[in-house]
Amino acid sequence: MIWDNNEDIRLEYCGTSKRAIQHVLDACRQERRPYVVITQKELGDQCYLGKSSKTERTTKETNLSTILVPVTMLEEEVYKAEICTYLARKTGAHLILLRANDYGSKAKRNIQRIITHIQTISERTGETISYEEQVAKGDSFSIHKELHNYPSEHQLVLLTASREYGLDDWLFGPPEQYVIRHSNVPVMLINPRADLFSLCD
């Protein structure tokens, strides 16, 4: 996979409990690189290859052919543009840009900015970047609850981590914790920082 032996992407393994997942999320709060979280559930019945800092875990290889990219109304969602474009170019993966079903225009504006970036890079490099836009059932506040049951054969979910934790996040866990806990595929996260690490050629 693209994160194997890739110093530009941090790889983390954890258990499936809320506490184990939150421990990883807390450890990565200041991470400038994208980071992939793989739980024991995925190691047991999915096909992924990778190394952690402490132990080496090897399973069967698989191809990264489809990436699910949910897009909400939050401004930091546009940070996904560079990362998903990079992943698509390096792996040839098809991007499913899943827009939150909001009444307002912010999610639509964010996804259009991501599409514009994809098209700009495609025109500049002459490479074909495969993508499609779909609309979720849920809005920006609930879209994360439908990702694990989304009817697409994706091998990775790309999320933006919460900028700050509110009361609900402290009590019940942030949205990214829910997605990781229920997902059957690895989840890649990027932290919304002004000095966000950019993957480049």
Task: State where each predicted segment sits.
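Gly/Ser-rich helix-loop-strand patches that form or flank binding pockets
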Residues: 21-66, 149-201
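Charged docking surfaces used in two-component/phosphorelay signaling
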Residues: 12-23, 136-144
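Short acidic/Ser/Thr-enriched loop-to-helix initiation segments
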Residues: 59-125, 181-183, 196-201
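Active-site rim loops that border cofactor/substrate pockets in soluble metabolic enzymes
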Residues: 121-141
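A structural signal for isolated positions on well-ordered beta-strands in alpha/beta enzyme cores
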Residues: 12, 68, 94-96, 130, ...
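Short glycine/serine/threonine/alanine-rich loop segments
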Residues: 7, 33, 93-94, 127, ...
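A short, acidic, amphipathic alpha-helical segment used as a generic capping/interface helix at domain edges
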Residues: 118-119, 137-151
